[in-house]
């Protein structure tokens, strides 16, 4: 329920309605597959999604007297560039991860040192460990650069979804069942996992399950 807002599964789990359920299964439409195809495999199939909003507060001043200000725009720009080093230098090269910034707002006038800046972005990962590291790294780097430039720093995180990690044994059983379904003539057991998130992950964080 309410998958489109990325919060339905959390509410469902929190309500206790799946406490007595041993396993969870889900099927999702995939327009990228030909008719009659079904894809399911064990292991990570969808990435996690966390959304961050960073607020940097400096001190405005006229550009002719920049020494009196603390530039939030320059600071935010440094943060955006530095965040790109996380995947390149802090994540195992054989792992897969994303740190993306999609929004940067700063300043009010062409000749005024920016007092405020806001950055919005997302992190994606296929393991709980990498997800936790990305979150720590974004916070650490942004905070450090803000302090270096004499600016104040705030960050808010929104937990949209954990990674979807299919239980291998159940995925094999699922494949056997699907292979017997009339109309499915192309069972795909190896495919590229998606950086898109799905809140079905909340059902399989603590209990076995499969998402196909």
What is each residue range found by the language model?
Residues 74-212:
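Metal-dependent amide/peptide-bond hydrolase catalytic core
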Residues 1-114, 197-198:
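Histidine/acidic-residue-rich, glycine-tolerant segments that coordinate divalent metal ions
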